[in-house]
Amino acid sequence: MVLTAGDKANVKTVWSKVGSHLEDYGSETLERLFVVYPSTKTYFPHFDLHHDSPQVRAHGKKVLSALGEAVNHIDDIPGALSKLSDLHAQNLRVDPVNFKLLNLCFVVVVGRHHPTILTPEVHVSLDKFLSAVAQNLTSKYR
């Protein structure tokens, strides 16, 4: 999926709001994921999955930091996510559908905290970007 110049600008606008809240928004995204899609909990058997768990907060920050890397390298998402793609495909073996579910939860979190910036056009751009991220994270699956 090709991101237009407008899409890239929209994603960067969203990230200008999100980037200073990585731990909070990341943890909220994961908590929402675990509640709405309980099967995703199976990848975290060693985590305390309760609200505001330090493990969920730390992992949420890590997830959104990786998204931030993709935003910062929006013209080379495959290069920015290559090592993470290897990790998920070869070691963690996360079912690819879970990236799409995470993306849905992240968009809800963005909309909840920044409803005025999540216009239909921005929503489409963010969805295209997140789809590109998910596609790249699963590109090394066999």
From Swiss-Prot:
Keywords: Heme, Iron, Metal-binding, Oxygen transport, Transport. Involved in oxygen transport from the lung to the various peripheral tissues. It comes from Aldabrachelys gigantea. Hemoglobin A is the major, and hemoglobin D the minor hemoglobin of this species. PROSITE patterns: GLOBIN. Red blood cells. Residues 2-142 form the Globin domain. Tetramer of alpha-1, alpha-2 and two identical beta chains. O2 binds at residue 59. Belongs to the globin family. One of its GO terms (cellular component) is blood microparticle. One of its GO terms (molecular function) is peroxidase activity. This is Hemoglobin A subunit alpha-2. GO terms for biological process: hydrogen peroxide catabolic process. Heme b binds at residue 88. Transmembrane segments: none annotated. PANTHER family: HEMOGLOBIN FAMILY MEMBER, HEMOGLOBIN SUBUNIT ALPHA.
